[in-house]
């Protein structure tokens, strides 16, 4: 059995990243895929579940994990730590399961430095106007917060050229097909097929 592939997925807020990842998992139940769940020291919000949205841990425990080198990447945001578990990702990949890592461009850089074989996907909105419309439609943020998100989006988008693949999420179904095409193409690469079908290949090449 071959190893799974780590997919780094980045996008500006409102581009549809989370929806595409969720749909990919939901519509392809036979694919061996999981989403990485980050650790955080912030408090649990209403509706959140430990181990589903985040692994909620105490600051002291998080800092102990940092000391032990158990995070692929971590950052402190507004006084709270957020980090990606190295152990969980490596164990999951070793089982032949692909892992999606939803992360920003800065975290993506850290991950690529440590796991250069990871594949990266950047999801773009079709226009700034459409991105702003989607943020407004969600009804979650004030005008000031939306303006801040739009400014952050420009910074995030400027790093699209650091990624292996780019998906334009203009039509959701088309973007989802593009997403699946990337996963399929990666699974059909020679090294993946050789690991998956080693027995068959040995038989085909036997005298």
Curated annotation (Swiss-Prot):
InterPro entries: GK/Ca_channel_bsu (IPR008145), Guanylate_kin-like_dom (IPR008144), Guanylate_kinase (IPR017665), Guanylate_kinase_CS (IPR020590), P-loop_NTPase (IPR027417). The keyword Iron-sulfur does not apply. The gene is gmk. Belongs to the guanylate kinase family. Keywords: ATP-binding, Cytoplasm, Kinase, Nucleotide-binding, Transferase. Essential for recycling GMP and indirectly, cGMP. It catalyses: GMP + ATP = GDP + ADP. This is Guanylate kinase. Pfam families: Guanylate_kin. PROSITE patterns: GUANYLATE_KINASE_1, GUANYLATE_KINASE_2. It comes from Vibrio vulnificus (strain YJ016). SUPFAM superfamilies: P-loop containing nucleoside triphosphate hydrolases (SSF52540).
């Amino acid at each position: 059995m071959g190893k799974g592939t780590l997919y780094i997925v980045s996008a500006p807020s409102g581009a549809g990243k989370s929806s595409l990842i969720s749909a990919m998992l939901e519509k392809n139940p036979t694919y061996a895929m999981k989403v990485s769940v980050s650790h955080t020291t912030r408090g649990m919000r209403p509706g959140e579940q430990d181990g589903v949205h985040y692994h909620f841990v105490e600051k002291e425990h998080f800092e102990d994990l940092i000391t032990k080198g158990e995070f692929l990447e971590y950052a402190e945001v507004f006084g709270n730590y957020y980090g990606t578990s190295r152990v969980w990702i490596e164990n999951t990949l070793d089982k032949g399961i692909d892992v999606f890592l939803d992360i920003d461009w800065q975290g993506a850089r850290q991950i690529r430095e440590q796991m250069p074989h990871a594949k990266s996907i950047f999801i773009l909105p079709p226009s700034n106007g459409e991105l702003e419309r989607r943020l407004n439609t969600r009804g979650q943020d004030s005008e000031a917060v939306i303006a801040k998100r739009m400014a952050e989006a420009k910074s995030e988008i400027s790093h699209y050229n650091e990624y292996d693949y780019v998906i334009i999420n203009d039509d959701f179904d088309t973007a989802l097909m593009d997403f699946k095409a990337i996963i399929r193409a990666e699974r059909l690469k020679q090294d993946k097929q050789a690991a998956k079908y080693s027995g068959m290949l040995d038989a085909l090449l036997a005298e």
